[in-house]
Amino acid sequence: MSAPDVRLTAWVHGWVQGVGFRWWTRCRALELGLTGYAANHADGRVLVVAQGPRAACQKLLQLLQGDTTPGRVAKVVADWSQSTEQITGFSER
């Protein structure tokens, strides 16, 4: 039996709006087989919600914290929980 899916909620701070960050995140998440979304917020942060296997979510978190993202990431505040919401695909909001 496989482990249950997890939910990664990551608040990405920095220069991450208007630079293709949500599109880039969507591409990486889909490559990893994750579902969820990336959404701009009025305060300049991007909220990333990803669901799927823990290893894939951890890889996405590493990518979000890495130096290959569009723009400039100052910090990522991440929270882990059980996947309870039914989300299909990965969208930009």
Curated annotation (Swiss-Prot):
This is Acylphosphatase. Belongs to the acylphosphatase family. Its EC number is 3.6.1.7. NCBIfam families: PRK14422.1. The keyword Hydrolase applies. PROSITE patterns: ACYLPHOSPHATASE_1, ACYLPHOSPHATASE_2, ACYLPHOSPHATASE_3. It catalyses: an acyl phosphate + H2O = a carboxylate + phosphate + H(+). Residues 7-93 form the Acylphosphatase-like domain. It is an enzyme of class 3 (hydrolase). InterPro entries: Acylphosphatase, Acylphosphatase-like_dom, Acylphosphatase-like_dom_sf, Acylphosphatase_CS. It comes from Mycobacterium tuberculosis (strain ATCC 25177 / H37Ra). Keywords: Hydrolase. The active site is at R22, N40. GO terms for molecular function: acylphosphatase activity.
